[in-house]
Amino acid sequence: MDCRVHMRPIGLTWVLQLTLAWILLEACGGSRPLQARSQQHHGLAADLGKGKLHLAGPCCPSEMDTTETSGPGNHPERCGVPSPECESFLEHLQRALRSRFRLRLLGVRQAQPLCEELCQAWFANCEDDITCGPTWLPLSEKRGCEPSCLTYGQTFADGTDLCRSALGHALPVAAPGARHCFNISISAVPRPRPGRRGREAPSRRSRSPRTSILDAAGSGSGSGSGSGP
């Protein structure tokens, strides 16, 4: 009984953190950062119960004077237009997190870390897109802004740094090659943009997880090494 009492709050915290992750992915639409620290989200349960989530100020300096949003479906101005590949990837990730959240509530799935390949694919698909900071901030605080609109590539060292910075303890990153981790499957990813640096293209293409990742909603034990069934 005592063990059960201690375990339930931990499970609830993880569910709330996962909920926050997919809601912010949906709200950001792939063009703005995932900026709400995975821990210390004051009043999150109440906001989720009311079906609303307050997102703090916008990203770029030119948008700093806009007012903070206060209702569902009303979000700050975007900082640039997302690339098709980044937007598509984040849409798939958001849907996978939503499915994972539902399975978690039903007790079908246990908490698993993110596959390292998923993080690298996220970074590869969004490297040239705008992000507004390396971490998420608590929902009760106003968001700070970088001096300029920086890209993922300018902000994060690699995919692992991206996941650890943006998602924190809500969804930790598994060790490279881990066999039991959280991943997603993308059937078709838009072609790389012409502006991508040619010297990086070969290494990107060699990373199969960028275009083919395991299904998070239907697979509880993804293969971080990329080995198929």
Curated annotation (Swiss-Prot):
InterPro entries: Folate_rcpt (IPR004269), Folate_rcpt-like (IPR018143)
Gly residues biased stretches: 219-229
Cysteine-cysteine disulfides: C79-C149, C86-C126, C119-C163, C132-C145
One term of GO molecular function: riboflavin transmembrane transporter activity
Signal among keywords: yes
Nucleotide-binding found in the keyword field: no
Record localization: Secreted, Extracellular space, Extracellular matrix, Interphotoreceptor matrix; Cell membrane
Bilayer topology term: Peripheral membrane protein
Gene Ontology CC terms: external side of plasma membrane; extracellular region; interphotoreceptor matrix
Sequence segments annotated as region (Disordered): 189-229
Keywords: Cell membrane, Disulfide bond, Extracellular matrix, Membrane, Secreted, Signal
Post-translational modifications reported in the UniProt record: Not N-glycosylated.
Tissue: Expressed in peripheral retina (at protein level).
Coiled-coil regions listed in the entry: none
Signal peptide (UniProt feature, chain positions): 1-30
Stated family: Belongs to the folate receptor family.
Function: Riboflavin-binding protein which might have a role in retinal flavin transport.
Record protein name field: Retbindin
Gene: RTBDN
